[in-house]
Each structure stands twice: as C-alpha cells, then as structure tokens.
C-alpha cells in the first residue's frame, strides 16, 4: 500500500511540473506555417483567413481556410494574398456591437 501511495504522489508531482502544467491556462496552441504556397487560390474557394504573427513562428503568414475546410498557408506580402484578404473582409464584415 505504501509503494502505491508513493508512486501516485510521484506521478502527481511529475504531472504538476510537466511543460503543460507549467504553461498555465492562458497559453494557447500556436499554429505556424513552415511552407507557403506560390499558387493563387481562386476566390470562390475561400471561406476565411487568419494571420499568423506570433514571435514563436519562423515566419509571418496568412492561413486561408477553403470551403472544403483545408488550411493553406500563404505569404502576406504577395499581392494576390492581400487582394484575397480584402475580398474576404468585404464578403463577411464584422458585426457591429
């Protein structure tokens, strides 16, 4: 009985000091893009986008979500990417409070 209690205590201590336990509830998983597409995505296939500007990622990127729920990383400096973001912004404006 004493061995199982000690083992349980060690497991709890290990879980408390694991990297996930130390990050706290405010941490959010970071999505990074490691390769960027060079191909222009047709506007009718795009559903939404989000910008990746985290300092934890190797490069800034835009992730487009297609209507088929596929995520595609693109270079935010490219003109077609900027035009696509403007198109999506006009298509679904943010609701006013």
UniProtKB/Swiss-Prot annotation:
Leader sequence residues: 1-23
Location(s) in or outside the cell: Secreted
Disulfide bonds: 32-57, 33-73
This protein's record includes keyword Iron: no
Taxonomic superkingdom: Eukaryota
Glycosylation sites: 94
An example Gene Ontology CC term for this record: extracellular space
InterPro entries: Chemokine_b/g/d (IPR039809), Chemokine_CC_CS (IPR000827), Chemokine_IL8-like_dom (IPR001811), Interleukin_8-like_sf (IPR036048)
BP GO annotations: antimicrobial humoral immune response mediated by antimicrobial peptide; chemokine-mediated signaling pathway; eosinophil chemotaxis; inflammatory response; positive regulation of cell migration
CDD domains in alphabetical order: Chemokine_CC
Pfam families registered for this protein in UniProt: IL8
Job description of the protein: In response to the presence of allergens, this protein directly promotes the accumulation of eosinophils (a prominent feature of allergic inflammatory reactions), but not lymphocytes, macrophages or neutrophils. Binds to CCR3.
Protein name, UniProt field: Eotaxin
Gene this protein is translated from: CCL11
